[in-house]
């Protein structure tokens, strides 16, 4: 019986040579590390070294998160990934009334360079690669990181890492936007230019499908809308006067890995192929690195369950295997208790150990792109590619990603997909072990990690001391220069860095930009 994939595409019970009738390997695949990069962006992939194990972490104060990072490094992680709390993500200080009840809850609270200094205390920034999941205020957190690097004596050209910096997906699926699309895109172009000149090894954006997938997007929708956003960013940078080969090699992407391994592998391979063609054929990129879709993967949090949480260990292992078979460059494996609360030390360690078992106790790293030539995976790769291209064409016909966002297209498509998933789960058609089948009459008790509510008062106290100690006139002068740059065409990151060095807070810097650029109010389109 034919099954339907997550993207609504057919999966036949048996595949044979006829599934690839007229299929040409040299056109569809090429060699690993060569156009169209279907088989991976590097010739040797994991046969030379494994992917980067980059575990996402951050909670409470900078002191607590710093301890967690040091523990992860001691356990063998090769890269850090910083989670920020909602006030930081929205550009508010911890003592702002709107931040009440949210400080340090879903990530670490960062209000100023003082907090950033503590967050990376004892961690040499020239020895570690750091990813920061931050979007609307991405420029601020990047500059705070650079300032801490300067204090450590680390040259900016030795700093490596990534800022997510993908505001378009915030309008589609997540909601942590601040400014309207036009100034947001201007800010992203300023970041591209600044990093080209000042922090050349930094990945300036991580164009993200993960959050769309968590909101309900199918695999085809995930890569279609993500790549459409990527096209918008490339056009923005080119319109700002940049040569495509000057910034495209530092673009990166971020996708989800579900338990449906075959379609996930097909999705990753299709995404690489589409992006390579777009960059070469539409934008005329000639640097091979400009054509490479390099991506980070996180296992699907939306598939984790609060019921029988230990079963999530199995789900995460399966999801991680799919990411590796699909050729990810780095991977975060979720902790089994994340459907309940922030990970404990033990669950975070088990999540990292899951990756280490995949890398060192299996043979998936022994050969490049193990599914190459598989009838089912090659057919599914072609099918996912075709479905994604159809959606991308619809976005183009609306005038690009921003116009489609204003019309509510991507959001409504994702909501329809999410509704279908919910219906199938409620009816039992979609089996979720421990939820709608194989349930326990009584769940075992589980004690989650809890964030101390006193953290909010602690952060407010730190802010009060900072404001009492700093040179307020220097802060005011720097913020005035920032407003002038925002009103004009100068790159805002240079005066922004001066303000942050003078110990202006994240909220103060964002408020200065709000005064000039305003804030985004979503349409009521559904």
Give the positions of each predicted feature.
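Short acidic (Asp/Glu) and glycine-rich catalytic loops that position anionic groups and cofactors
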Residues: 49, 95-98, 168-170, 206-209, ...
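Generic beta-strand/beta-sheet core signal
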Residues: 54-56, 82-85, 131-135, 162-164, ...
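Generic secondary-structure signature for well-ordered alpha-helical cores
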Residues: 74, 78, 121-125, 150-155, ...
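Short beta-alpha connecting loops at secondary-structure transitions
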Residues: 101-105, 169-179, 212-217, 255-260, ...
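Flexible glycine/proline-rich, aromatic-decorated loop/lid segments
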Residues: 243-247, 285-299, 307-334, 343-368, ...
